[in-house]
């Protein structure tokens, strides 16, 4: 659907070109108004054009307004030095809601659907997923849901760490201790720690481990059998967590790209991009002080080689139009070097196809990196289990009479919702403080606030004996609270555009929180049952219900019909 912002931008662009045909193409500065008494949107371009046109901003604003059709607006005002404030008419907002209602059911389809690959979560085999994987998994899943909703073909890739020296250590340790079967990741993690200690202390063990890496790469039957067993145990454990988080992923580990590594290095060499540095093969770039090493001095490959091969495969074989990799911001330099190398090699046709979606750290309430008291990473499964228990405690405190059945059903939904929302509502680039106490609050910018507004609408339906709310209804907007709610609802598609453009889910969480506040004000100020506007107000309730439900689904949150 054409958003209010794009509609207004089109009107202002045409008006500026009619008023000042000598101007070249402009990037307009039109934003939602910062305060309600300024109207719905404001155009700030008159100030920018003052120097170019050598006229006062106010005179420029007057010329622009003179070329804008008045029909969609109840007022167009010039304020201050030359800000143009627009207020849409209530009739126009009502008509736009009808279109919004139809398109909400089908998703706001992108004009040019693309093949989008999102690489996220990506834990390492033989290690527990920890709190660092939480951010990648939640952010990646949200972006995948949003891209899918607007019609893109999304491939969700789990680029698990399933190759390398660690497997040589594990295979050697398993061979020497005659362990035939491993059934749980906890056993595997304990073995990994023991194998790592031996590798650091015992030079002979280290040599045998390195030999097993070579054996694995060469397809040795015993080494491959143990490797497959290790991967199977780990992936089963990962899938348990993905089920709890309601996240879908297609696993394609580092090992998948092994057949292409030598060929990629040879191709880079044929393009004169490779320089020998202390025996290692590196790709240098003028813009960076360090190179991307693609082959070690001993002839071995590393994760950079795999990443280059993966990028090439995703473009050439998967036919990706866009590639997103969701990892912590600490890997930013690596991905800048990766992009530069793939551009130079022609694997990436142009800039803008690849994006590193970086994110900050999770901190404890003291502002330190979130770890156990002993300094180890907090296991993700334990964190999720704790969230569910904390949510149950919160429910009991609010509803002492809650049944065990309700507690068992609602606790996991509230706990997982709270964790996801707390993460997504923080700007992904920033570090954020993890606090169960804050994330489980029933007020403020939390998952509980969204859910409470949704449950309130379900309560309206129950009280009035309605199975569903009207999806089509002639609408007339009268009250300020109705107008504010209508305007906020209509901003949903432009917020979705912004979320996907910036790859930042917090724009969506901020919007949904604002929507709950507008709905709560509407519920307070506008009587529904038995009023002259009952059907129209039920229609607004229905649109709010559907928008909240859709928005929460895009965040990966679940709804409840009552609390």
UniProtKB/Swiss-Prot annotation:
InterPro entries assigned to the protein according to its UniProt record, in alphabetical order: aa-tRNA-synth_I_CS (IPR001412), Arg-tRNA-ligase (IPR001278), Arg-tRNA-synth_N (IPR005148), Arg-tRNA-synth_N_sf (IPR036695), ArgRS_core (IPR035684), DALR_anticod-bd (IPR008909), Rossmann-like_a/b/a_fold (IPR014729), tRNAsynth_Ia_anticodon-bd (IPR009080)
Catalytic EC class: ligase
Localization: Cytoplasm
EC number per UniProt: 6.1.1.19
Coiled coil (residue ranges): none
GO terms assigned for molecular function: arginine-tRNA ligase activity; ATP binding
GO terms of biological process kind: arginyl-tRNA aminoacylation
Family stated for the protein in its record: Belongs to the class-I aminoacyl-tRNA synthetase family.
Subunit composition and interactions: Monomer.
Listed name of the protein: Arginine--tRNA ligase
Species for this entry: Chlamydia trachomatis serovar A (strain ATCC VR-571B / DSM 19440 / HAR-13)
Gene name of the encoded protein: argS
